[in-house]
């Protein structure tokens, strides 16, 4: 498998074309960004940690019947993935109120929600990824049919059930997470991008300690140490 051309570079990853038109390579970067990339830093080894964490969680979800773009890891920070036409919607699933939800609705921080809340955000850097509803998504033609929005919600909730149960065994509360989806060569919606402490909030169930990118956002502690702890707990549960 050879990289042939840089297809896309985002805040956290580079996506490379390969000599197989249906296969790409995702290279996880060591960069850290927050607040629409107004805050930036580098953390050596962070890309490798996110690659390993994402690979483990993709495998877990595949075992539970949720299709993903994951094929295999080929280095510490490189993952072979199936090519997918990305849907420009970020699907956010919330179990505990924190972050923007508390600011928008005045729900006290740390409130357990009565059910998993699924939100859509328009993936658009220039507009700062605004919160949208189903009608917005249809008007913007982000999906072909309303049924695809229902599929995104269903998949978001299914992923939440699997991950919540898994992280419970790791003594972590899955507070919320962001996932992205794409369509494979046959038009099936599959989970893409990554699942890592960059895109999830994890709170220790005993101490309440944050083990995710909020440490960087709010200068609360060492990101690499936290990500290493998340990987350690994931590995232990999967053994």
From Swiss-Prot:
Q: Name one GO biological process term.
A: cobalamin biosynthetic process
What PANTHER family does the record tag this protein with? MULTIFUNCTIONAL PROTEIN ADE2, SI:DKEY-6E2.2
Q: State one molecular function term (GO).
A: ATP binding
Q: Its pathway?
A: Purine metabolism; IMP biosynthesis via de novo pathway; 5-amino-1-(5-phospho-D-ribosyl)imidazole-4-carboxamide from 5-amino-1-(5-phospho-D-ribosyl)imidazole-4-carboxylate: step 1/2
Q: Fetch the CDD domains from UniProt.
A: SAICAR_synt_PurC (cd01415)
Q: Does the keyword Repeat apply?
A: no
Q: Which domain of life is it from?
A: Bacteria
Family indicated by similarity: Belongs to the SAICAR synthetase family.
Q: Which InterPro entries match?
A: SAICAR_synt/ADE2_N (IPR028923), SAICAR_synt_PurC (IPR033934), SAICAR_synth (IPR001636), SAICAR_synthetase (IPR050089)
Q: Which UniProt keywords apply?
A: ATP-binding, Ligase, Nucleotide-binding, Purine biosynthesis
Q: What EC number is given for this enzyme? A: 6.3.2.6
Q: What Pfam families does UniProt report for this protein, alphabetically?
A: SAICAR_synt
Q: Which Gene3D superfamilies match?
A: ATP-grasp fold, B domain, Phosphorylase Kinase, domain 1
What this protein catalyses is: 5-amino-1-(5-phospho-D-ribosyl)imidazole-4-carboxylate + L-aspartate + ATP = (2S)-2-[5-amino-1-(5-phospho-beta-D-ribosyl)imidazole-4-carboxamido]succinate + ADP + phosphate + 2 H(+)
UniProt keyword annotation of ATP-binding present: yes
What organism is the protein native to? Nitratiruptor sp. (strain SB155-2)
What positions belong to coiled-coil segments?
none
- EC top class, in one word? ligase
Name used for this protein in its record: Phosphoribosylaminoimidazole-succinocarboxamide synthase
């Amino acid at each position: 498998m050879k990289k042939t051309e840089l297809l896309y570079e985002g805040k956290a990853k580079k996506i490379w074309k390969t000599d197989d038109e249906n296969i790409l390579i995702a290279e996880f970067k060591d960069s850290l960004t927050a607040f629409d990339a107004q805050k930036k830093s580098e953390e050596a080894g962070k890309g490798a940690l996110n690659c390993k964490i994402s690979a483990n969680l993709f495998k877990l979800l595949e075992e539970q019947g949720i299709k993903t773009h994951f094929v295999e890891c080929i280095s510490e920070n490189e993952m072979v993935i199936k090519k997918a036409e990305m849907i420009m919607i970020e699907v956010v699933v919330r179990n505990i109120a924190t972050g923007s939800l508390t600011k928008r609705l005045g729900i006290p921080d740390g409130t357990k929600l009565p059910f998993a809340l699924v939100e859509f955000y328009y993936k658009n850097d220039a507009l700062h990824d605004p919160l949208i509803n189903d009608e917005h998504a249809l008007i913007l033609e982000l999906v072909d049919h309303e049924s695809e929005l229902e599929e995104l919600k269903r998949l978001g909730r299914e992923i939440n059930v699997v991950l919540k149960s898994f992280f419970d065994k790791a003594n972590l509360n899955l507070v919320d997470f962001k996932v992205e989806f794409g369509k494979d060569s046959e038009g099936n919606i599959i989970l893409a991008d990554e699942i890592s402490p960059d895109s999830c909030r994890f709170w220790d169930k005993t101490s309440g300690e944050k083990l995710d990118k909020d440490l960087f956002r709010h200068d609360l502690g060492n990101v690499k140490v936290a990500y290493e702890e998340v990987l350690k707990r994931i590995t232990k549960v999967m053994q």
